């Protein structure tokens, strides 16, 4: 019995010797597990660190894209009231913006080039207009020397038409800006169209023509003629105005006749119609005056004034030299008030919007006056023809129904070069 107790006691005493050994095995396994967990944790952190920059870059790109889209949508919201950009994609809006910016930059480069070249030559500033008068030689008698005054080929400006509207614009449009020509006489602007923002021209479907105010003198076309066009659309607030077109174009043609010069971009197409005339002088329609009103017709209420030129060719008919009239030139509109009454206090003088035309030196000038009803229908017409002169004045009377009118025209040869007439005369 005692022996058994001692044996059991011995077993109990031996057990503690084995427990530490068993405890060491358990601690080693736990250590290995902890190492594996730490390693996996480190690998996971490395992977996260690697992926983090890529995620941040993607988020930055998304933010930038979102910002651009928000800016475009903001711009679209600003013009939504005018229905300008409804239905346009972000890409279309971006392309339109880039094209207008490119047009304006091209025009700015052209202007800087002109200023660097022409400024030192005495042409003064870019926006300066020609100061040469269309009546420069009108008062000189006898006929001036042909060294300073010439008969030469010129460009007749017939019309400027807004033939197409695109890019969300809709008629009617309030257009302002400048269309001008430059020739070799002085290289200054010869204004054809000029309207300020506070007094734009309303362009309508039934009358898409710009109301011309020039040229102020004949346009010489011995060398290329440069046309400049800068037009904008007035849309209420200044910040809402839109650029319509900015462009320049050189034009030169040897053959006489009517020619069309096109300007086109994403927003419009404009056609400038010109006619090249040979051996011309310049005529200034000084006045068209109502001398006596008729009982049936009052010319000043609503009327239209236009002119055309006719040249003559010398031909031998039946053995005799005979002058035969050629086909008349294109029509030049001097005043168009078909539906608007003339302002009061004009004392019978019709307020012409343009006055200078080119006439072939052996030709004639035909002036036509039409009176119209309130609906714009022509109800009466009268005309008068005047033979061209090298200098001086011509004056004739004619009738429109039972009203009597009088036209006065000044004639002048052309200036070939501004420097020639400014040169001191030797005594």
Describe each model-derived feature in a short phrase.
Residues 9, 14, 26, 31-94:
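Long, intrinsically disordered low-complexity tandem-repeat regions enriched in serine/threonine/proline
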Residues 2-21, 35, 76-161, 165, ...:
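Peripheral membrane interaction modules
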